[in-house]
Amino acid sequence: MEHFRNIGIIGRLGSTQVVDTIRRLKRFLLDRHLHVILDEGIAELLPGHGLQVSSRKQLGEVCDMVVVVGGDGSMLGAARALARYKVPVLGINRGSLGFLTDIRPDELETRVAEVLDGQYTVESRFLLETQVRRKLEPIGQGDALNDVVLHPGKSTRMIEFELYIDGQFVCSQKSDGLIVSTPTGSTAYALSAGGPIMHPKLDAIVIVPMYPHTLSSRPIVVAGNSELKIVVSPKMDIYPQVSCDGQNHFTCSPGDIVTISKKPQRLQLIHPLDHNYYEVCRTKLGWGSRLGGGS
C-alpha cells in the first residue's frame, strides 16, 4: 500500500539536467500507478507530458507529497508556497550544495521507492514572516525559510537602525545590514557573516550584524518565539532593502519599521531514514574526517 498517492513535482527552471531528472521521476512514479501533478512552471518544459498541471497553491491543496527537483533555492521557493498547506516535501538535489535536497540523482529510484514504502522521517522546519510598515501602513510582507536580511541594496553606504526584541530596546547600530536567520538558514548567509551553526531542531533565531561599525556587535541567539522590530533611521538619505531568502525584496524608506517573527505554519521536510545532519555539514562544508581515515 502506497503512503502517498497524489505526487506533485516542482523543478528549477532553465536547467536541462533538472528536466531530465523530472522525466525519470515521472516515469518511475507512473510505473507505480501514482497520480502525478506537475507545477505549471516546469510543465512548459515537458511537451506532451499528458499529466495534470496545477499552480503551487493547488499542489498544496491536493497533493500528499511534493517532490522538488533542483537546489536549495528551489526548495526555499517551494517551502514558502507550500508550508501553509502542511504537505510534506522531498528534495532531489540538482544544485550545488543541497542542504535541503537530500537525494542524489543517481539514487533517485531507490530513495524515492523507500519513501513511498514508508521508510522516511519528517522534520518540521519553521519559517519567518516579515512586514515592512511606513507610518503604520504595511507596504510589503513576505516569508523566509532561511533568513530575512536588511541590506543597503544598490548603495555601498552603511545603514543606521535600531533593534528591539519583544518590545525591549537592544541597540542602535551602524553596519552593512542585519541578517535574521532560522536554524535552517544558519548554514547559509548567516554563516558567511560569522554566525553560529544551529541544529534545525532548535527553536531559536540568530541575529547576525553585517560588518558592524562597532566591533563589539556580535551575533545574538534568541528564543524562536521572539518578535523583532527594526527601525530604519529617519536621518538616512539612502533606501535599504529587506530580502526574504534572497528571492523576494522590499525597498524601505528612512523611518520605516520592519517586524520579524516566527510564522505559525511550518515546512514538513521529508528525509530518508539514514539522514544525518552532521554528515551533511561535514560533506557540504568540508569538515575533516575522523582520524585514521574513517568518515
From Swiss-Prot:
This is NAD kinase. HAMAP family: NAD_kinase. Involved in the regulation of the intracellular balance of NAD and NADP, and is a key enzyme in the biosynthesis of NADP. Catalyzes specifically the phosphorylation on 2'-hydroxyl of the adenosine moiety of NAD to yield NADP. It catalyses: NAD(+) + ATP = ADP + NADP(+) + H(+). It is found in: Cytoplasm. GO terms for cellular component: cytoplasm. SUPFAM superfamilies: NAD kinase/diacylglycerol kinase-like. One of its GO terms (biological process) is NAD metabolic process. Belongs to the NAD kinase family. Coiled coil: none annotated. It comes from the Bacteria. Gene3D superfamilies: Probable inorganic polyphosphate/atp-NAD kinase, domain 1 (3.40.50.10330), Probable inorganic polyphosphate/atp-NAD kinase, domain 2 (2.60.200.30). NAD(+) binds at D72, G73, N146, D147, R157, K174, D176, T187, A188, Y189, A190, L191, S192, Q247. Its cofactor is a divalent metal cation. PANTHER family: NAD KINASE (PTHR20275:SF0). Keywords: ATP-binding, Cytoplasm, Kinase, NAD, NADP, Nucleotide-binding, Transferase. The gene is nadK. Its main location: cytoplasm. Its EC number is 2.7.1.23. It comes from Azotobacter vinelandii (strain DJ / ATCC BAA-1303). The active site is at D72. GO terms for molecular function: ATP binding; metal ion binding; NAD binding; NAD+ kinase activity.
